[in-house]
Amino acid sequence: SSAASDVYKRQTALLCGMALAASGLMLQTTFNNPLADPSILGISSGASLGVALVMLAGAGTITAGVFTLSGFLSVIIGAFIGSMLVMGIILFFSTLIKNSIMLLIIGIMIGYITSSAISLLNFFSTAEGVHSYMIWGMGNFGGVSLQQLPFFSLVTMAGLLITILLIKPLNALLLGTRYAENLGINIRRTRNLLLVATGLLTATTTAFCGPISFIGLAVPHIARLMLGTSNHNSLLPVTMLTGGAIALLCNFICILPGEAGIIPLNAVTPVIGAPIIIYVIVNQRKIQYFN
């Protein structure tokens, strides 16, 4: 029934928002960069390439939202491998390049490379493959069926749990890597755990709901502006809750047309996210986030 599917959608939106916001916060802290997030660093596009390979090359007949279990698992695995690969590349470059702006540019370049690969896959794919990929790419919280919801919830909760366990190392990273090492934090292990958690959360949300932009980028800033602190003890839970709330708001806007159809999610998130980012950039001198 539509009432039941609305409940699943809300639950998916809540978890998705929490996952993307937590990923954005972790990346901003890890790279000490207020403009880091899964979509800008190319992690979402890595996941999208994984999905495209499965949807368009593997079996052009997989349609968005009605994956069989094996097809749907392969989509998740594809997304996870894609996002982890990009995270690995970014981490590799982060050891070579200390300038965080340059790192963002590398992420954007990776995004361009993956989107050109996706364009090629679209060119050689079947019409229904392209159509299902296009629909998926618009973003939709309705992509998780009742059968898939327990799996989706479990994986997302596991990723969020890892982030909560990383609060202490994240706080240490804020003060700089040298200081964190003096506190006895294993930087490499922390970064690897952050890599896995962010990869897991980004891959799961991207595989199910499409590449959703701006939630991961904007929400940590909203939370910081509300709290006036960068301490992850309070910042991480508030970021998660705000992410969930904003995703629910976006979901509400998406379903406003009712019978006329659903507004694509990626038509709504930038409208909310972009003004916040512009505000943060304009007032960056006043807002002291990072050390």
Listing of model-derived features with the role each one plays in the protein:
Residues 5-291:
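Alpha-helical transmembrane segments in inner-membrane proteins
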